[in-house]
């Protein structure tokens, strides 16, 4: 049986390496799922996961995240995006299309997408936008643009065709664009 988050955090605060083992046991699957989807390469995902657990070790303490899974996945996503930027710079090719690239048309210019996404105001506004969506649409948006799930995975999960998923994602991006324009972000 997996440990409770509070027990895992106590291990981190005691500087016990068991904290990493317990975190991997409880949340390693979710972390790897996100990294595999983002990096599209098993070896890169495994290497990045090591960086994620090191970052987790280095930030707890002083952080005491609740819930631990959200904190872990935020670190994983940030590490994965850094790794993807590094790998694409090394390869000098476009690589796979990262779902965030689909959002570029909804946000500012392509050159400022990363800086804009880092802005707390924009982050809060996107969260407000998501709260206005029906549950299924919100799940679809988050799975695509946070977890980087493929259209095929989502179609299987929702029981919809891939074209329906693509169409709904397009409409969601258009709604986000309209929302951000109305709120003065674009």
Task: Specify the residue positions occupied by each region the protein language model found.
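Sigma70-family region 2
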Residues: 13-14, 40, 50-68, 86
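DNA-recognition helix of helix-turn-helix
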Residues: 67, 81, 126, 137, ...
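A short, charge-rich alpha-helical start-of-domain segment used by transcription regulators
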Residues: 9-33
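Residue-level preference for hydrophobic side chains embedded in well-ordered alpha helices
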Residues: 23, 27, 31, 52, ...
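Amphipathic alpha-helical segment used for protein-protein interaction
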Residues: 14-17, 109-142, 147-149, 153-156, ...
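Short, small-hydrophobic-rich alpha-helical interface motif
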Residues: 12, 31, 35, 45-56, ...
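Arg/Lys-rich amphipathic alpha helix in sigma70-family domain 2
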Residues: 74-96, 119
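Short amphipathic helical patch at the helix-1/turn junction of helix-turn-helix
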Residues: 24-25, 36, 144-146, 170
């Amino acid at each position: 049986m997996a440990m409770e988050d509070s027990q895992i955090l106590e291990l981190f605060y005691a500087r016990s390496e068991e904290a990493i083992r317990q975190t991997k046991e409880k949340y390693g699957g979710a972390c790897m799922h996100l990294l595999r989807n983002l990096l599209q390469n098993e070896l890169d995902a495994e290497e990045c996961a090591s960086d994620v657990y090191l970052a987790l070790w280095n930030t707890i303490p002083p952080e005491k995240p609740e819930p631990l899974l959200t904190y872990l996945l935020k670190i994983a996503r940030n590490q994965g995006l850094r790794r993807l930027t590094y790998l694409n710079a090394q390869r000098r090719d476009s690589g796979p299309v990262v779902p965030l690239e689909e959002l570029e048309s909804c946000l500012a210019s392509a050159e400022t997408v990363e800086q804009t996404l880092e802005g707390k105001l924009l982050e809060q506004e996107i969260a407000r936008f998501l709260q206005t969506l029906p549950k299924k649409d919100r799940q679809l948006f988050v799975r695509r643009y946070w977890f980087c799930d493929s259209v095929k995975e989502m179609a299987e999960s929702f029981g919809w065709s891939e074209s329906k998923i693509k169409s709904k994602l397009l409409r969601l991006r258009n709604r986000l664009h309209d929302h951000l324009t109305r709120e003065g972000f674009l």
